[in-house]
Amino acid sequence: MDIRIALAGNPNSGKTTLFNALTGSNQFVGNWPGVTVEKKEGRLKKHDHVIIMDLPGIYSLSPYTLEEVVARNYLIQDRPDAILNIIDGTNLERNLYLTTQLTELGIPVVVAVNMIDVVNKNGDKI
């Protein structure tokens, strides 16, 4: 039986970079929002029974943009087994709004703080 894990988070938070590392894929990564506008599926390296879904970057589950519609529909209709919420450590307040919405879906959520090197470089702490 397959395990389905969705990568969710704000635009430009590192979801696709993590997706590529986990799956061995080579999806395009850009340093601006809106690069991923559709969901991408891959299998975890050395664990073929784990499906990783790279969702478009979104700020909320309110379906105002195409990216939010794609991500929301997958999370609510397809209901993955777990959500890996990638958040940008340099802007926690903006990122945690989506985190709150994700936890309300009743799906297990793991929060991964990304860009911690930039946080440390700025002299900040989490």
Predicted regions and their residues:
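Conserved C-terminal guanine-recognition region of P-loop GTPase G domains, centered on the G4
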Residues: 42-47, 70-126
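Conserved G1/Walker A P-loop phosphate-binding module
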Residues: 1-65, 78, 82
